C-alpha cells in the first residue's frame, strides 16, 4: 500500500492521493511531502523484507529510500527538512523552515537499514550525516533529552522538549533500532 503514495513523476512518497489514486498538484495539501513519514515507511518495509524474505520488494524500497534521503536532505545546512512541497512552492505556516527531531530519527534508521541490506556506502554516509546533525543541533547537552525542533539553519527556536506530538517514542526507538542494526553489522 505504501507504494501507492509514490508519485512516479518525482520518485518520492507524498502524504496524500486523490480517491482515484492520482496526485493533486493544484493544492498545498496535495503537494505535501514529509520525508520523515516516507523514510519511516521505508524502514518498516525493510523490516518486512528482512523477516519475510520477500526480496522482490527490496529494489523498489531502496530506490525510494535513496530518493527520499536526497530529497529531504538540506544540502546547505544539513539535516532532514520536515516538510516539502513537491513543486518547491512555499508551504503554509513555513513548515519547510523547520527540522524536527523525529524525521532525523526515522531517516537515520532508514539509512542504516538500507546500508545493512545493500552495502551501498551512500546510505552509510547519509546515516553519518543525519546522526551528526541530530546530535549536534537537537540534543540538550545539559539535560539529556532532545529539543523538538530547530530552525532551518540549526538554531534553536524554543526550549520545548515535549509537545502534543513529542513524547518518549521516536528517540528511544531510533537509539535501539540503530544499536540493533550496528550489532548485526559487526
Regions found by a protein language model. Name each.
Residues 1-186:
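Glycan-recognition and catalytic cores of secretory/periplasmic carbohydrate-active enzymes
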Amino acid at each position: 500500500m505504501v507504494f501507492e503514495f509514490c508519485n512516479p513523476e518525482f520518485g518520492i512518497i507524498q502524504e496524500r492521493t486523490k480517491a482515484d489514486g492520482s496526485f493533486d498538484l493544484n493544492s498545498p495539501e496535495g503537494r505535501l511531502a514529509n520525508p520523515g513519514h516516507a523514510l519511516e515507511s521505508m524502514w518498516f518495509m525493510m523490516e518486512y523484507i528482512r523477516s519475510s524474505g520477500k526480496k522482490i520488494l527490496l529494489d523498489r524500497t531502496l530506490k525510494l529510500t535513496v530518493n527520499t534521503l536526497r530529497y529531504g536532505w538540506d544540502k546547505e545546512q544539513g539535516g532532514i527538512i520536515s516538510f516539502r512541497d513537491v513543486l518547491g512552492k512555499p508551504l503554509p505556516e513555513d513548515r519547510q523552515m523547520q527540522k524536527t527531531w523525529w524525521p532525523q530519527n526515522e531517516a537515520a534508521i532508514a539509512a542504516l537499514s538500507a546500508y545493512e541490506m545493500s552495502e551501498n556506502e551512500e546510505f552509510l554516509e547519509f546515516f553519518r550525516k543525519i546522526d551528526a546533525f541530530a546530535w549536534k543541533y537537537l540534543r540538550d547537552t545539559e539535560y539529556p533529552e532532545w529539543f523538538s525542533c530547530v530552525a532551518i539553519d540549526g538554531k534553536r527556536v524554543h526550549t520545548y522538549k515535549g509537545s502534543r506530538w513529542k513524547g518518549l517514542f521516536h528517540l528511544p526507538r531510533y537509539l535501539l533500532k540503530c544499536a540493533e542494526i550496528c550489532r548485526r553489522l559487526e
